[in-house]
Amino acid sequence: MPNTQSPYNAFAMLLSSNGHPVTPAELHGLLIGRSCAGAGFDADAWLADAAQLLEIEPGDSVRNALVGLQEMVKGELTSDDMAIVLLLPTDDAALSDRATALGQWCQGFVTGFGLNAGGKDLSDEAKEVLQDLVAISQVQEALEESEDGESDYMEVMEYLRVAPLLLFSELAKPAAPAPKPSLH
């Protein structure tokens, strides 16, 4: 039985009870994607991008949740940690549900990245990450309820926790200030 108190389920209930036909995974992917493309962390710009998926204007509770999600993502992307936390169903959800959410996360990421990358030149590694994300978004039903399926899911999820950081560091991470010359 899925954990109804998980952050994913709580956000899903908030979205559905407010008439938004989108999953937390897709919204989180959109946010990470746009952030990795260099969109910055302006709340109004994020809310405008999110509104396209939400289909109707979000109420205060959804707006507050979206701004809170953005603050969490900003902290993850700008910290020295080398991984992000994906907003996905917990491990006690059916593998098919988790795989579907993983695909939705990738769809959101590719959309957010595409809306904000604006023809920027990408390294071969960055292009490969984007191709991987597109491929993952299209094979969401391919995982079977088995030990191998579970292992494949975990492997893909671990990849997605670090792969976007390559894009962020290439396109969006603020340059470190140049060291001041020392006086001798």
From Swiss-Prot:
InterPro entries: YgfB-like, YgfB-like_sf. It comes from Pseudomonas putida (strain ATCC 47054 / DSM 6125 / CFBP 8728 / NCIMB 11950 / KT2440). This is UPF0149 protein PP_5201. Transmembrane segments: none annotated. GO terms for cellular component: cytosol. Belongs to the UPF0149 family.
